[in-house]
């Protein structure tokens, strides 16, 4: 059983969760530049209806990636279910680059065999799917138009999860980058205090808002969830005891461990890349400073020493430095401290303010909140040349979190007077909003790869 399967299975047993999405992605910009692709409805070889449509989930995943535009099934010249049934000349008019075909066959009580094949439509049009190549001195079918072909057996509850797996395969084969459709997001939901005894809720859900699960509810604020690098724990800040404290919660056992209870500020916990340390902000010595705590021993090391406020730490991918926000230059800007030498250098200079910096997994860019002419927007800075690109046009943006493949950013913003989550691609072309059905949503955190 995979790590993600174990976590999801445990949560479904011990917690009351909604299988429907209380967050639903609404795409607002970016489809025109996406690549056309065909996700043919999978053939159902059983009685009644398929437990869940794999093709619909895959189409939704690829559409929300901002890189693909699945064509409507009514625009398909047919609905083949394997590569042998494809009429490449008929498909040429659709302009698609790739075609996904597949089938689902019941194999016993709650067991279903899924077959799928990803076909290079352009190569198939050239060869007709009948390319030949020399192998061992003989001409054989090369199948060089087949990009991937797999089969597996799943349960009825595993349809949606396996559809995300198919999406990952398609995405990686066509972009060369790992897909992030099997990931999850954590966030805080705030409901009306007058009508809810526990208005603050810490929630995790699939990346697309489905399978929402409440981990914790509280009468007092919850904030700043942060995933461990193995995806099994969350660190967060709670005011349950009328003061800020940092906890780590295990997603297998749901057990909670209090990490800090210092006087003053205890905030902004974030796991190191190896999961052994936790960076945080503490004001126990009088001024908000950056600290690093060893998770096992709780031993603390103070990192910054400055009269200005230092906050919002994040780790560089190699774990050797921290990025943080500081007012030491007058207005909040982003700095970098080397943990071996304690040398600090300023990273951002453009704009009135820059806050909440996080470096992309490849180390090439930094995502942050940029304030220019009084507007707070999500921006990305090229760390080689220092150029900053403003990515969003939304209002009062905050708390950006990057997908583990570096392709997308989730953040909190104000829309029609409510805090909602939004998505923007790293190049700024694709934009979407995740409006909540109830309450305000903030402090998003994207999980690492869970498999």
From Swiss-Prot:
Keywords: Cell cycle, Cell division, Periplasm, Signal. Disulfide bonds: none annotated. GO terms for biological process: cell division; protein import. Residues 1-23 form the signal peptide. Its main location: periplasm. Gene3D superfamilies: TolB, C-terminal domain (2.120.10.30), TolB, N-terminal domain (3.40.50.10070). InterPro entries: 6-blade_b-propeller_TolB-like (IPR011042), PD40 (IPR011659), Tol-Pal_TolB (IPR014167), TolB_N (IPR007195). GO terms for cellular component: periplasmic space. It comes from the Bacteria. The Tol-Pal system is composed of five core proteins: the inner membrane proteins TolA, TolQ and TolR, the periplasmic protein TolB and the outer membrane protein Pal. They form a network linking the inner and outer membranes and the peptidoglycan layer. HAMAP family: TolB. Part of the Tol-Pal system, which plays a role in outer membrane invagination during cell division and is important for maintaining outer membrane integrity. Belongs to the TolB family. This is Tol-Pal system protein TolB. It comes from Pseudoalteromonas atlantica (strain T6c / ATCC BAA-1087). The lineage of its organism: Bacteria, Pseudomonadati, Pseudomonadota, Gammaproteobacteria, Alteromonadales.
């Amino acid at each position: 059983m995979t790590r993600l399967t174990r976590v999801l299975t445990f949560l479904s047993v011990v917690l009351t969760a909604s299988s429907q999405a209380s967050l639903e992605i609404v795409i607002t910009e970016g489809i025109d530049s996406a690549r056309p692709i065909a996700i043919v409805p999978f053939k159902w070889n059983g009685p009644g209806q398929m437990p869940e449509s794999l093709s619909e989930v895959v189409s939704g995943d690829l559409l929300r990636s901002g890189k693909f535009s699945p064509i409507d099934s009514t625009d398909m010249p047919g609905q083949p279910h394997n590569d042998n049934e494809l009429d490449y000349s008929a498909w040429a008019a659709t302009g698609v680059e790739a075609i996904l075909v597949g089938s689902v066959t019941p194999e016993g009580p709650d067991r279903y065999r899924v077959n799928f094949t990803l076909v290079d439509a352009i190569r198939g049009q050239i060869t007709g799917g009948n390319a030949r190549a020399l192998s061992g001195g003989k001409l054989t079918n090369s199948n060089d138009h087949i990009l991937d072909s797999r089969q597996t057996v799943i349960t009825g509850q595993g349809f949606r999860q396996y559809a995300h797996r198919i999406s990952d395969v398609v995405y990686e084969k066509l972009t060369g980058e790992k897909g992030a459709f099997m990931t999850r997001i954590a966030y805080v939901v705030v409901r009306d205090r007058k009508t809810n005894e526990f208005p603050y809720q810490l929630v995790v859900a699939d990346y697309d808002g489905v399978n929402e699960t409440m981990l914790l509810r509280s009468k007092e604020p919850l904030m700043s969830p942060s995933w461990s690098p193995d995806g099994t724990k969350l660190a967060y800040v709670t005011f349950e005891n009328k003061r800020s404290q940092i906890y780590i919660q295990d997603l297998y056992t749901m057990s909670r461990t209090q990490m800090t209870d210092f006087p003053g500020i205890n905030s902004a916990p974030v796991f190191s890349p190896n999961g052994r340390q936790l960076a945080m902000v503490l004001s126990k010595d009088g001024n908000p400073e950056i600290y690093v705590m060893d998770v096992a021993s709780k031993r603390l090391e103070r990192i910054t020493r400055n009269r200005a406020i230092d906050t919002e730490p994040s780790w560089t991918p190699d774990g050797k430095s921290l990025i943080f926000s500081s007012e030491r230059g007058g207005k909040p800007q982003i700095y970098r401290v080397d943990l071996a030498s304690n040398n600090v250098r300023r990273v951002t200079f453009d704009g009135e303010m820059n806050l909440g910096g996080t470096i992309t997994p490849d180390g090439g860019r930094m995502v942050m909140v940029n304030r220019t002419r009084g507007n707070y927007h999500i921006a990305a800075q090229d760390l080689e040349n220092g150029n900053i690109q403003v990515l969003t046009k939304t209002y009062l943006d905050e708390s950006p979190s990057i997908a583990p493949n570096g392709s997308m950013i989730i953040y909190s913003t104000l829309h029609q007077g409510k805090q909602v989550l939004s998505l923007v691609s790293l190049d700024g072309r694709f934009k979407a909003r995740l409006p909540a059905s109830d309450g305000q949503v903030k402090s998003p955190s994207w999980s690492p790869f869970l498999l």
